[in-house]
Amino acid sequence: MPREDRATWKSNYFLKIIQLLDDYPKCFIVGADNVGSKQMQQIRMSLRGKAVVLMGKNTMMRKAIRGHLENNPALEKLLPHIRGNVGFVFTKEDLTEIRDMLLANKVPAAARAGAIAPCEVTVPAQNTGLGPEKTSFFQALGITTKISRGTIEILSDVQLIKTGDKVGASEATLLNMLNISPFSFGLIIQQVFDNGSIYNPEVLDITEDTLHSRFLEGVRNVASVCLQIGYPTVASVPHSIINGYKRVLALSVETEYTFPLAEKVKAFLADPSAFVAAAPVAAASTAAPAAAAAAPAKVEAKEESEESDEDMGFGLFD
């Protein structure tokens, strides 16, 4: 490619990334390891109208951003995260929705020898369908097996590869023999940039319910601390009032001092049997109307059954 064309392409790329950074207030920094051109094309098509994917050399992306810092100083937060095989996904839509679309575009992939495992791989207990001649292969990997109807059967689940481990040739061969594609590759969100703020993608998993529960937990902690040190706050005052009322009530019971709300408690302590006797009476009074309502229903049901008997012909010779 001639130097002039290359220079023109670079200039257009700089203009494009600057325009995208100005037009879109939100973007993802995504890792693109093991993502092929065909899969990238499918991702672009699925995001069409909702987001724009931009890939490029890290040096060019950094240079374009540094040249635009005068107009938008917040972009400097992106620079430390532009390393490795990364790109941008720009959007104006809900970030969680775009995240879910990226996850939906992951494709299963077979294990390759020498690759770094992005997740844990467990081989489930199963009949492999492989002949007995492969027994030594399983023994070398420490997998307990038995011969069942002329084929090898794995007796229990086996953790074959841990996250971050390098896939060995034997592990890759076994997974391929069992037709297991343990990995899935796609654009992996590494950082989220939202209106000048940058944060981890785990923040997108925080829902309103999560915020509500954490807020209530914080209120409870504040109330507990304030009660212990005797410092009144909005969170602790209701508990302080209740505790104070309990103390006054206890003092009233132990002394001759009384007030209207304490009279019932004193009466109960003086004669608990009176309250026990009153409980069945109250229960009976509530049960009586229910029984009265049920009685006509039973009579009605009986009359209906007699009528149905007559309809069936049981009174034919009466």
UniProtKB/Swiss-Prot annotation:
<feature type="modified residue" description="Phosphoserine">
    <location>
        <position position="305"/>
    </location>
</feature>
<feature type="cross-link" description="Glycyl lysine isopeptide (Lys-Gly) (interchain with G-Cter in SUMO1); alternate">
    <location>
        <position position="298"/>
    </location>
</feature>
<dbReference type="Pfam" id="PF00428">
    <property type="entry name" value="Ribosomal_60s"/>
</dbReference>
<dbReference type="InterPro" id="IPR040637">
    <property type="entry name" value="Ribosomal_uL10-like_insert"/>
</dbReference>
<dbReference type="GO" id="GO:0022625">
    <property type="term" value="C:cytosolic large ribosomal subunit"/>
</dbReference>
<dbReference type="GO" id="GO:0014069">
    <property type="term" value="C:postsynaptic density"/>
</dbReference>
<dbReference type="GO" id="GO:0003735">
    <property type="term" value="F:structural constituent of ribosome"/>
</dbReference>
<keyword id="KW-0689">Ribosomal protein</keyword>
<feature type="region of interest" description="Disordered">
    <location>
        <begin position="298"/>
        <end position="318"/>
    </location>
</feature>
<feature type="compositionally biased region" description="Acidic residues">
    <location>
        <begin position="303"/>
        <end position="312"/>
    </location>
</feature>
<dbReference type="InterPro" id="IPR050323">
    <property type="entry name" value="Ribosomal_protein_uL10"/>
</dbReference>
<dbReference type="InterPro" id="IPR043141">
    <property type="entry name" value="Ribosomal_uL10-like_sf"/>
</dbReference>
<dbReference type="GO" id="GO:0005634">
    <property type="term" value="C:nucleus"/>
</dbReference>
<keyword id="KW-0687">Ribonucleoprotein</keyword>
<dbReference type="Pfam" id="PF17777">
    <property type="entry name" value="RL10P_insert"/>
</dbReference>
<dbReference type="InterPro" id="IPR043164">
    <property type="entry name" value="Ribosomal_uL10-like_insert_sf"/>
</dbReference>
<dbReference type="InterPro" id="IPR001790">
    <property type="entry name" value="Ribosomal_uL10"/>
</dbReference>
<dbReference type="GO" id="GO:0036464">
    <property type="term" value="C:cytoplasmic ribonucleoprotein granule"/>
</dbReference>
<comment type="subunit">
    <text>P0 forms a pentameric complex by interaction with dimers of P1 and P2. Identified in a IGF2BP1-dependent mRNP granule complex containing untranslated mRNAs. Interacts with APEX1. Interacts with FMR1 isoform 6.</text>
</comment>
<feature type="modified residue" description="Phosphothreonine">
    <location>
        <position position="59"/>
    </location>
</feature>
<feature type="modified residue" description="Phosphoserine">
    <location>
        <position position="308"/>
    </location>
</feature>
<comment type="function">
    <text>Ribosomal protein P0 is the functional equivalent of E.coli protein L10.</text>
</comment>
<dbReference type="GO" id="GO:0070180">
    <property type="term" value="F:large ribosomal subunit rRNA binding"/>
</dbReference>
<dbReference type="GO" id="GO:0005783">
    <property type="term" value="C:endoplasmic reticulum"/>
</dbReference>
<keyword id="KW-0597">Phosphoprotein</keyword>
<feature type="cross-link" description="Glycyl lysine isopeptide (Lys-Gly) (interchain with G-Cter in ubiquitin)">
    <location>
        <position position="264"/>
    </location>
</feature>
<dbReference type="GO" id="GO:0002181">
    <property type="term" value="P:cytoplasmic translation"/>
</dbReference>
<dbReference type="InterPro" id="IPR030670">
    <property type="entry name" value="uL10_eukaryotes"/>
</dbReference>
<dbReference type="Pfam" id="PF00466">
    <property type="entry name" value="Ribosomal_L10"/>
</dbReference>
<feature type="modified residue" description="Phosphotyrosine">
    <location>
        <position position="24"/>
    </location>
</feature>
<keyword id="KW-1017">Isopeptide bond</keyword>
<dbReference type="GO" id="GO:0000027">
    <property type="term" value="P:ribosomal large subunit assembly"/>
</dbReference>
<protein>
    <recommendedName>
        <fullName>Large ribosomal subunit protein uL10</fullName>
    </recommendedName>
</protein>
<keyword id="KW-0539">Nucleus</keyword>
<comment type="similarity">
    <text>Belongs to the universal ribosomal protein uL10 family.</text>
</comment>
<keyword id="KW-0963">Cytoplasm</keyword>
<feature type="cross-link" description="Glycyl lysine isopeptide (Lys-Gly) (interchain with G-Cter in SUMO2); alternate">
    <location>
        <position position="298"/>
    </location>
</feature>
<keyword id="KW-0832">Ubl conjugation</keyword>
